[in-house]
Swiss-Prot record:
One GO process term, biological-process aspect: carbon fixation
Gene3D superfamilies: Phosphoenolpyruvate/pyruvate domain
Example of a GO cellular component annotation carried by this entry: cytosol
Origin species: Chromohalobacter salexigens (strain ATCC BAA-138 / DSM 3043 / CIP 106854 / NCIMB 13768 / 1H11)
Single GO term (MF): magnesium ion binding
Protein name in UniProt: Phosphoenolpyruvate carboxylase
Family: Belongs to the PEPCase type 1 family.
Pfam families referenced in this protein's UniProt entry, alphabetically: PEPcase
Names of required cofactors: Mg(2+)
Length: 883
């Protein structure tokens, strides 16, 4: 590794790599390890502009005997995973997140002082943080490539590194940790990297709960303690006891859009799992508290509650523990399909758990035992405030067309015609009238289709569940007010009094452009306002809009839609919460959370925000307590700053510039992706898209429909496929033409540089584009093409795309006024450079295996098929993202 990288990171990569080498030698012999070293050496020299070494590498890989292909791919895949462990460990130990620009790493203490310096009163700080509502929504897609079995081993390896570093003067402890490390690496090597079956939605939900148990359960009280201390120092006050600036929700088990595996029964099971896991975790907390709170001094209120018991805290906690254990047993019985009988009442609400703990806390403070009150008891109070009785709030997501189908069948059954044939005004009139009507609409014995029955059953599950366990009902592919009214009516018909927030999801370019008009019309309906109250949630889709229109056009449409929504909700005196459906990659709205939030339009955050955390990003951001703590700090910093120190409104000339850039980029993108007849055949030929369906990433199918072109693909495999070949096309196509056009005009360069310097939205976009181009590699993309594409027309298209990428890099460097990419972030550049010699062989092997697979018409041996899947996992690990 480069000598500039931190010594401890270098040492840990070397320790893990050496141990992996010994493990492989024990399994396959020293001769095989020599092959790995030969491949690595050729790849390393090939990265030093040695074209002969690059040629030798390809020849060497193509000449490997079939029996070596799988273990070679596994060796490089595991090394990249171990590099990720070392990097993750480094970040946790030094509490540093490598941002895009030096000096932009958010610091909560510094931010509080900056806010005070801007003239905000100390009380304003406390009130803003206490009222802050940031929900991080854990989702299962683009899913985690690495098996959870291996994740547990990797976490244990990280613990060994921690032990070894902390035992420099205790050789026997360090030696035991080294021995355990060798064992774990051997376990990982002898474990299949690829799942044999796709995880079920319940499996995904269990993984989400495991992240809470293993990481967030500790990180949440740690975060509140830090926030408490900083507020006390800066504002002279502590955070209110029941404040929960950051909470967690989930789509795992609730997101049924395009996933037939998420049924009403699955949703009910996941809700019960959340109740069971929460009760189990609280029971552990209460056992500890019952052991520790042996004091006899108590205030009158607690004495009145427990009587003359000599250990009043234990007496109260004993009762509470019995209820929590009964809740755990009840949930388990429901999951097992068994009856449950107990004379102890179960815990139904957050307050039933919180109130007894608060009584203990107040009593301890009243009798002068504040130090004890602010220990483990306060941690549990904070957990209850954040996690409630279900750990996460479960969102429900369904596509608008499924609700329309319900009313189409229903209107036909009632002799009213076909709902699908009605125009928007007719639909609204019907839905609003039924929302006001006291009589039921759905017949008791209605013989509807299985699809409609499933939708209704889902609403019945929602109706049976306590409101605290549920989050938002998200409507994907929403385009009209009737899409929201339909869900409201289904809640009324099936759910009675239960009303969840309903969030239309605007995810195509046209939908984003119409979002303001839809919400304006919706909020102007008196019947809807009476039902919705003074709040409205709207979800902004990043993945599909970028696939639909190109990244630059989508980013600008998202920005403008948010501006319009802020203005409309302000006019209607409605509190707007924006829900950002971001992924891990640039093409799906990914990037550093702090920069992304601060690049939103002024007024769009205002203390309230929801954002998805997806797949492998959950592990990178929240998989370990220290890193989870840092991630929560970043979100708190960004939302607090965006609320109290919002960015300035963009200047009118900047808007005009973005309108023009967006239009040029959109036309260039559509001209290739939608209008070039060679594009889809090229995409299918040059990427591993067709093989992705066999990679058991998650419970969701890779395609919305089995036939069709790019439009039938979900955004996740669309981006995954291009990432594998290093062309990274979805995140940049069209941008180069837009920027080049402007640079060729008088004053264009100065205007773009000014926008970059003074407009966070534009600056953040360019920063993410720079990172993306640093990971792209046209030479690797060209090799895939040489190996997999025969038709001259397709080869010509590929050459054109690579030339566009090269021109974009030149144009971007001009705007940035730099000689090289990532010139000002050398750590990130070095991290990419260090990984390349381990990723390059996987690209070479993947192209070879794809060609063999096609030659065999998909009938390659199971070993080669597995090797192909391992190359995909390894490249994703090396680039630190999937889709």
């Amino acid at each position: 590794m480069s000598h500039d990288l931190h010594e401890s990171l270098r040492d840990n990569v070397r320790i893990l790599g050496d141990s992996l080498g010994r493990t492989i030698a024990d399994d396959l012999g020293d001769g095989f390890v020599d092959k790995i070293e030969t491949i690595r050496g050729l790849a390393k020299r090939g990265r030093q502009d040695d074209s002969e070494s690059r040629r030798e590498l390809i020849e060497y890989l193509r000449a490997l005997p079939e029996k070596d292909l799988l273990p070679v791919t596994r060796a490089f895949n595991q090394f990249l995973n171990f590099s990720n462990i070392a990097e993750q460990h480094y970040r946790a130990r030094f509490r540093r997140v490598e941002d895009y620009k030096p000096g932009t790493q958010p610091d909560l203490g510094e931010l509080l002082e900056r806010i005070r310096g801007a003239g905000h009163a100390p009380r304003k700080l406390v009130e803003t943080l206490a009222a802050m509502r940031v929900e991080l929504v854990l989702t299962a897609h683009p899913t985690e490539v690495i098996r959870r079995t291996l994740i547990r081993k990797y976490d244990a390896i990280d613990e060994c590194l921690t032990t070894m570093e902390g035992a420099t003067e205790r050789e026997e402890i360090a030696a035991r940790a080294r021995g355990r490390l060798e064992e774990l690496i051997s376990q990982a090597w002898h474990t299949d990297e690829i799942r044999h079956e796709r995880p079920t939605p319940v499996d995904e939900a269990k993984w989400g709960f495991a992240v809470i148990e293993n990481s967030l359960w500790q990180a949440v009280p740690d975060f509140h303690r830090e926030l408490d201390d900083l507020l006390l120092a800066s504002a002279g006050e502590r955070l209110p006891l029941d404040a929960a600036p950051l909470r967690f929700a989930s789509w795992m088990g609730g997101d049924r859009d395009g996933n037939p595996n998420v049924t009403a029964r699955v949703t009910e099971e996941v809700l019960l799992l959340g109740r069971w896991m929460a009760a189990d975790l609280y029971a552990r907390d209460l056992l500890r508290l019952k052991s520790e709170l042996s004091m006899w001094k108590a205030n009158g209120a607690l004495r009145a509650e427990v009587g003359s018991d000599p250990e009043p805290y234990r007496a109260l906690l004993k009762r509470l523990l019995a209820r929590v254990e009964a809740t755990r047993d009840w949930a388990k019985a429901r999951l097992d399909g068994r009856p449950f009988d107990s004379n102890v009442a179960i815990i139904e609400t957050r307050d039933q758990l919180y109130a007894p703990l608060l009584s203990c806390y107040r009593s301890l403070c009243d009798v002068g035992l504040d130090t004890i009150a602010n220990g483990a008891l306060l941690d549990t109070l904070r957990r209850v405030a954040v996690f409630g009785v279900s750990l996460t709030k479960l969102d429900i997501r369904q596509e608008a067309g499924r609700h329309a189908q319900v009313f189409d069948e229903l209107s036909d059954c009632l002799g009213l015609g076909h709902y699908r044939d009605w125009d928007e005004a007719q639909r609204q009139d019907f839905l609003l009238e039924e929302l006001e009507s006291p009589r039921p609409l759905i017949p008791r014995r209605w013989d509807c289709s299985a699809e409609t029955r499933e939708v209704i059953d889902t609403f019945r599950v929602i109706a049976r569940e306590h409101r605290e366990a549920l989050g938002t009902y998200v409507i994907s592919m929403a385009g009209q007010p009737s899409d929201v009214l339909a869900v409201a009516l289904l809640m009324k018909e099936v759910g009675g009094d239960l009303q969840l927030p309903i969030a239309p999801l605007f995810e195509t370019l046209d939908d984003l452009n119409r979002a303001g008009d839809v919400i304006e019309r919706l909020l102007s309906l008196p019947g809807y306002r009476r039902m919705a109250g003074d709040g409205q949630e709207v979800m902004i889709g990043y993945s599909d809009s970028a696939k639909d229109a190109g990244q630059l056009a989508a980013a600008w449409a998202q920005y403008r839609a948010q501006e319009q929504l802020v203005g409309i909700c302000r006019q209607h005196d409605v509190a707007l919460t924006l829900f950002h459906g971001r992924g891990g990659t640039v093409g799906r709205g990914g990037g550093p959370a702090h920069a992304a939030i601060l690049s939103q339009p002024p007024g769009s955050v205002n203390g309230s925000l929801r954002v998805t955390e997806q797949g492998e990003m959950i592990r990178f951001k929240f998989g370990q307590p220290d890193i989870a703590l840092r991630s929560m700090e970043i979100y708190a910093c960004a939302v607090l700053e965006a609320t109290l120190l919002p960015p300035p409104d963009p200047e009118p000339v900047w808007r005009e510039e973005m309108d023009r850039l967006s239009d040029i980029a959109h036309r260039a993108y559509v001209g290739v992706v939608r209008e070039d007849p060679d594009f889809v055949p090229y995409f299918r030929s040059v990427t591993p898209e067709s093989a992705l369906g066999r990679l058991p990433l998650g419970s969701r199918p890779a395609k919305r429909r089995q036939e069709g072109g790019v439009e039938s693909l979900r955004a996740i495999p669309w981006i995954f496929a291009w990432t594998q070949t290093r062309l990274m096309l979805p995140a940049w196509l069209g941008s180069g033409e837009a920027f080049a056009t402007r640079l060729d005009e008088p004053g264009g360069r100065e205007r773009l540089r000014d926008m970059r310097a003074r407009w966070p939205f534009f600056g953040t976009y360019l920063d993410m584009l720079e990172m993306l181009l640093a990971k792209a590699d046209p030479d690797i993309a060209a090799y895939y093409e040489r190996r997999l594409v025969d038709e001259p027309a397709l080869q010509a298209l590929g050459k054109s795309l690579r030339e566009r990428l090269s021109r974009l890099e030149t144009v971007l460097l001009d705007i940035l006024d730099q000689d090289t990419l990532l010139e000002h972030t050398p750590l990130i550049r070095q991290a990419i450079e260090v990984r390349n010699p381990y990723i390059d062989p996987l690209h070479g092997l993947q192209a070879e295996l794809l060609q063999r697979n096609r030659d065999a018409d998909g009938a390659i041996s199971p070993e080669l098929s597995r090797a192909l899947m391992v190359t995909m996992a390894g490249i994703a690990a090396g680039l630190r993202n999937t889709g």
